[in-house]
A protein has these predicted regions:
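Conserved SGNH/GDSL esterase-like catalytic core that processes O-acyl groups on lipids
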Residues: 30, 42-132
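Boundary at the C-terminal end of the N-terminal hydrophobic targeting segment
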Residues: 22-26
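Bacterial N-terminal signal peptides that target proteins for export
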Residues: 2-11
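Conserved catalytic region of serine esterases and O-acyltransferases that act on ester linkages
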Residues: 28, 218, 222-225, 229-231, ...
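Structured segments of extracytoplasmic/periplasmic soluble domains
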Residues: 38, 42, 50-55, 119, ...
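Bacterial N-terminal signal peptides
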Residues: 10-19
Length: 283
């Protein structure tokens, strides 16, 4: 009887041990590639790695950069396999390396990407037709070159400052609210049409942050994000949407940012991920 009990105890212990071994996973590395321009540079190249590192999340971030690049130009580059990009890659050590004259095909083959994101250039970001003229073919090109597990992402960028002098602000009658709503509408319509499940709502996060004391320091020229405050809001949005972790309370912040500014930025991002189509006043 005693031997039988010992045998049962041993078998149970062995079973539990084996379950633990089977369920144990090596440290996951999340790999994100953005096909973008200076707005993807603003969003993912600065603070996203540090936000992730603070929570022991391992991440590799790639950005295919051409300033002001539209979806149409990305598609033409793909068709011609042009080495037209600056490929900025942040590795596991947090160091950014830039390789010039890189092609989309080469970037897609460089890693087993978990996420690949697309965005329209800022002036056309709220014009739905310009998304659909190029994105379906561009997305098909990408899907043919990445693993089946790779998730497609749309990056919902932000409206210009109310006083912006950007030449394309006329597309929205120099009206920030109109531009914001147009971007939200265009991105969500494109996502629905193409079956994209993930939208990173940086535009809504920035709009939320504009209800806080950060409002006057979110851009550096009326459209590109401020290198500290605006970029931090965008990175917080990417962090919460991609990693599915509440960014509020993450301890990483740029040195020049106050705790109150950090709180406003994080809450702006969190609210945007929760309600990506609705602006919330952050107190």
């Amino acid at each position: 009887m005693i031997m039988k009990k010992r045998l049962i105890t041993f078998l149970l212990a062995f079973f539990c041990l084996m379950c633990g071994v089977m369920n144990a996973q090596p440290d996951k590395v999340v790999k994100i590639l953005t096909i973008g321009n200076s707005f993807s540079e603003d969003a993912v190249e600065q603070h996203l790695y540090d936000l992730a590192k603070t929570e022991d999340i391992k991440v590799i971030i790639g950005n295919m950069y051409i300033g002001g690049c539209s979806l149409e130009k990305h598609l033409n580059n793909a068709r011609d396999n042009k080495g037209a990009y600056k490929y900025r890659k942040i590795g596991l050590n947090g160091k950014k390396v830039e390789t010039k004259s890189f092609s989309l095909e080469a970037a897609l083959a460089d890693e087993q990407w978990d996420y690949v994101s697309f965005q329209q250039n800022s002036g056309r970001s709220g014009m739905y037709d310009t998304w659909m003229e190029s994105l379906p073919e561009l997305m098909a090109y990408v899907k043919a070159r990445v693993p089946k597990k790779t998730k497609m992402v749309l990056h919902q960028t932000w409206a210009y400052d109310k006083t912006s002098t950007h030449k394309d602000f006329k597309n929205y009658k120099h009206d920030q609210d109109l531009m914001y709503k147009s971007i939200v509408d265009a991105v969500h319509r494109a996502a629905k049409e193409l079956g994209v499940k993930i939208i990173v709502p940086c535009g809504t996060a920035i709009q939320n942050a504009r209800t806080t004391p950060l409002c006057d320091c979110l851009t550096r020229d009326g459209y590109h994000l401020h290198k500290t405050y605006g970029r931090y809001v965008a990175a917080c949005t990417w962090y919460e949407k991609i990693f599915k972790k509440n960014v509020v309370g993450n301890t990483y912040k740029p040195a020049e940012m106050t705790p109150e500014q950090q709180r406003h930025a994080q809450q702006s991002a969190h609210a945007a991920v929760k309600k990506p189509k609705k602006v919330k006043t952050i107190k």
